[in-house]
Amino acid sequence: MPVANSKSTTKATKLVELLRDKRSLLIVMQDNPDPDSIAAAAALRRIANTLTDVHCSIAYGGVIGRSENRAVAGYLGLNFRSIEEIDLEKYDAVALVDTQPRAGNNSLPEERQPDIVLDHHPLRAETRAAPFSDVRKRYGAVSTILVEYLGELGISPDPPLATALLYAIRSDTQDLGTEAVQADIDAAEALYPLANTRMLSAIQRGRVPRSYYTALAKALENARVYGKCIIADLGDVDNPDMMGEMADLFLRHEGIEWVLCHGAHDGKLLLSMRTSQSRKRAGDVMKRIVSRIGTGGGHATAAGGQVPLKKGTRAEREGRHKTFRDRLLREVGGTNGRGRRLLGSA
């Protein structure tokens, strides 16, 4: 499965050299991991298990909530563990995948410096301290980096891993659309003959629980339209991935260019943003929306953020909602005021 890239040749070799000096590796994904995090972590584990004697564990914070994400994790057949169950002292190396130190979207304690950082979001200053890092913000998916590593190291992924990697790249690039670069397309083409296309289709049509429809009903009820923007407060959510799912859905509305969904989970307000236009990067807009009150970032058309709740009162949450709304509309030029309900006439 050759996928040529001179940078990956050098990086893959250095990665293996580092791992050969370690006994145990903890691979930490972003909180509430998506298919890109899951597949990339599995690929890093495959590299470590194939070429070194290092023992690997994969951990995450939050939950694996979205049906497609659960399907990918289940198909890989690996033991993905909550980081709360992990004794970090038992691992002499830690890797961050699809996230970076102090990015606000992973549960690795700040005092623990990662040895390896693999990501495709803008480089953070803290990442420079890692002995090994490969951050390519132009890439649509971190899985693309791992596919290049596999190719350079002569490792052919089995059907479950190839399927997970292919789905991850397609998912994170909007099916090889505006977020994709040539490297993502090349990686997807290399994976396709190795993937289980029947399973790929099954992942995309994953079953959802009744709670999904409850959350959907609440999102529809609370969504308000401000010109070319939709903003929706989902209230309390059990599944943090619901914000992203609803944002994807609302962006399909005719004439809508920006969507912001937020909801409360585990003492924080989680935000998800989508846009169909390219005048401003969603990741940059999200950073400004949560400036001085939380953390956030992302890519050109998709972004996420989180803001801690100090009291969790209704007044605090309504105040944050107003802040999010006002800042977004100031950024993208939507109609201010109360807006109008997506459903109904008020």
Model-derived segments and spans:
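A structured phosphate/pyrophosphate-recognition subdomain
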Residues: 2-32, 42-49, 125-268, 301-302, ...
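Low-complexity, glycine/alanine/valine/leucine- and proline-rich hydrophobic stretches
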Residues: 279-296
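Primary mode marks residue(s) on the alpha4-beta5-alpha5 output face of response regulator receiver
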Residues: 273-274
